[in-house]
């Protein structure tokens, strides 16, 4: 039986293995293995909400082990450190507990076909002090770590007698993650008052977004940037554009002009790069972001048994640009590779990948949602905001749940999430 390994259980990887399990795994036509360093999947566009504490993995997470049992594939917990394409094997680090004790030794897994869906991470560009003093939001563990630090700072500020000193939060990166996190944190400032912190309010927060480029949300149309800046301005979030960070210290971020942006909590949400093991894979070509360059079928040019999807996948478009690292890209790639792996098993022709940009949306907590619709959703680049934008934003997550759980369980999960939001706490205190 052919063994297919998928590395990474993010938006693309989990959807892919779910699709394959229906056609190959449950029918005993292939052995499917998903490898991820986390036990729980949370849709990456929601990680900033985990960090702020408005959702948690209990209600919005998918336990890989349980999902694997229900869908007929195998889950392996571990961090991949090397892919040996010559010998068609992957190598995992020893699995350690929180105290550093070994649970499982280093392992290696052989494959017949490999799909890398490992996602991406923020790029600190080697800026001194960033790794030591900043929080990142690339994984569930990192988001939960920031949330614990946020709770501690809110409690500390709530017990201070002087209201003049604010809780200072600085976020480097004016993309979707940075701007959405800023708005969500402002909302939390007011929400904390109802959850045992009577002296807290949004007025006691000082939130700054630091963007190196000339405008925030640089990948989106300028009209969206202007609407986003207006929404952030209304809730007193400071936006510093054309501001490069040269160093991070215990006091805050230092700009290339020598100014210090003081902060009690520092977040780095800038840049994109592929995981190191992806960059180290031999016999493949990488672009400047470390992504693996693939052919029209999302295979590496020198191997029909090696596919790449999601943020680690480099697909060059006719105009010379690259398919952007977004959830919608991963979703479309997962569908294409699932079709191709199933077609290969049946001896049928492969399907070339065609990226369709449906637009982008940015959700600023309860305050505003702005974006643009393209592709099949609109004949032109249509600007949307307000309720329509929020409806489309929510529908993106709905599509993901349906792809991961199927129609019935996906809809039940949505209903459960709605009931939980109505009856449960709006702010996570642990």
Across the structure, where does each feature detected by a protein language model lie?
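Beta1-alpha1 glycine-rich phosphate/pyrophosphate-binding loop at the start
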Residues: 1-82, 179-219, 267
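Conserved N-terminal Rossmann-fold NAD(P)-binding element of oxidoreductases
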Residues: 7-8, 116, 172
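A Rossmann-like FAD-binding core segment of flavoenzymes
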Residues: 29, 71, 75-94, 186-296, ...
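FAD-binding core/adjacent interface of flavoenzyme oxidoreductases
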Residues: 75-168, 267
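FAD-site-proximal beta/loop scaffold in flavoenzymes
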Residues: 132-160, 251-253, 260-332
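Rossmann-like NAD(P)H-binding beta-loop-alpha module
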Residues: 146-202
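C-terminal, flexible cofactor-proximal segment of oxidoreductases
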Residues: 333, 338-430
């Amino acid at each position: 039986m052919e063994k297919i390994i998928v590395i990474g259980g993010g938006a693309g990887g989990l959807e892919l293995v779910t699709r394959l399990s229906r056609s190959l795994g449950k029918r005993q036509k292939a052995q499917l293995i998903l490898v991820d360093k986390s036990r729980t999947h949370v849709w990456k566009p929601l990680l900033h909400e985990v960090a702020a504490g408005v959702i948690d993995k209990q209600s919005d997470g998918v336990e890989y082990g349980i999902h694997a049992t229900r869908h007929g594939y195998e889950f392996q917990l571990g961090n991949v450190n090397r892919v040996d394409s010559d010998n068609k094997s992957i190598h995992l680090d020893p699995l350690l507990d929180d105290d550093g004790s070994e649970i499982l030794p280093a392992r290696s897994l052989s494959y017949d076909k490999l799909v890398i869906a490992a996602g991406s991470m923020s790029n600190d560009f080697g800026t001194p002090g960033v790794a030591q003093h900043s929080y990142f939001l690339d994984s569930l563990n990192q988001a939960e770590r920031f949330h614990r630090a946020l709770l501690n700072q809110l409690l500390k500020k709530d017990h201070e007698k002087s209201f003049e000193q604010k809780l200072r939060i600085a976020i480097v990166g004016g993309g979707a993650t940075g701007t959405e996190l800023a708005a969500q944190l402002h909302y939390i400032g007011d929400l904390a008052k109802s959850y045992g912190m009577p002296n807290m309010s949004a007025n006691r927060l000082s939130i700054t977004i630091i963007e190196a480029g000339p405008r925030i949300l640089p990948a989106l149309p300028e009209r969206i940037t202007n609407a986003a800046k207006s929404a952030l301005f209304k809730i007193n979030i400071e936006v510093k554009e054309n501001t490069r960070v040269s160093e991070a210290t215990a006091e805050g971020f230092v700009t290339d002009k020598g100014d210090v942006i003081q902060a009690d909590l520092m977040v780095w949400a800038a840049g994109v790069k592929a995981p190191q093991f992806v960059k180290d894979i031999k016999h493949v070509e990488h672009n400047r972001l470390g992504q693996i360059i693939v052919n029209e079928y999302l295979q590496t040019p020198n191997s029909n048994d090696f596919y790449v999807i999601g943020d680690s996948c480099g697909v060059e478009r006719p105009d010379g640009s690259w398919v952007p690292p977004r959830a919608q890209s991963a979703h479309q790639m997962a569908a294409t590779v699932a079709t191709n792996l199933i077609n290969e098993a049946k001896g049928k022709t492969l399907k070339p990948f065609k990226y369709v940009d449906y637009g982008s949306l940015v959700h600023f907590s309860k305050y505003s949602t702005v974006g643009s619709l393209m592709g099949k959703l609109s004949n032109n680049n249509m600007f949307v905001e307000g309720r329509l934008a929020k409806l489309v934003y929510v529908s993106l997550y709905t599509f993901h749940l349906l792809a991961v759980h199927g129609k019935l369980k996906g809809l039940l999960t949505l209903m459960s999430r709605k009931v939980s939001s109505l009856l449960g706490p709006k702010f996570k205190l642990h």
